[in-house]
Amino acid sequence: MKITKIHLFHVAMPLIEPWVTAYGNQANIESLFVGIEANGLIGWGECAPAPLPFYNSEYTAGAFYLARDGLGPKIINQTITSADQLTSLFSQFKGNEFAKSAFDTAWWDLYAKEMKTPLWKLIGGNNPEIDVGADIPVQTDVNKLIDRTAEAIELGYGRVKFKFNRQCSFQMMEAVRNSFPDLVMHIDCNSGFTLDDLDLFR
């Protein structure tokens, strides 16, 4: 497929409530959308690093600039027949896996459309549906945390990821587990702890 056009959008989605994590509060979720066009088709990909490099070195504006000035020009007018070839073309750019992943996802979407095959089937999946989870921002009140978890379960989520920082307590997580013993739980600290805190997690 010869890449004839690339579409880039840096967007900010306002949130209903601030997104509280170990590295701070966000009023918006910023994303980079990448569209790769070939043969009259467009494949879409997205990445959503933080608006500033809080928990790793990437951030949304940086991903946009690299996409515009580096990754995009590298593949425009190129005939790309595999994801490995795409990866190889990007090899001179160090790191920046968020930005690269948006192009990779867009290429796979484009390839699936070209092949007229659902992407899940193209990459070896055997089920067109997957379970999704809910995310709950940092909470400092255990009752509110349990209420938010109950709301997620009532909406049909069988998996919940909890944002966690130093203002939270492990007793709160224990209270959630005791209230919902069958819930699949994930705790996301967003690089808010170091190896010096290892004993907290034992």
Label the predicted regions.
Residues 1-55:
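Structured beta-strand/loop patches that form or line metal/cofactor-binding pockets in enzymes
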Residues 16, 44-46, 55-57, 142-144, ...:
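Short acidic, gly/pro-rich beta-turn/loop elements at beta-sheet edges
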Residues 33, 109, 149:
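Short glycine-/small-residue-rich flexible loop motifs, especially phosphate/cofactor-binding loops
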Residues 29, 62, 66, 81, ...:
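Conserved active-site and cofactor/substrate-binding residues in soluble primary-metabolism enzymes
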Residues 1-10, 87-91, 112-113, 117-129:
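N-terminal amphipathic alpha-helix/helix-capping segment at the start of soluble metabolic enzymes
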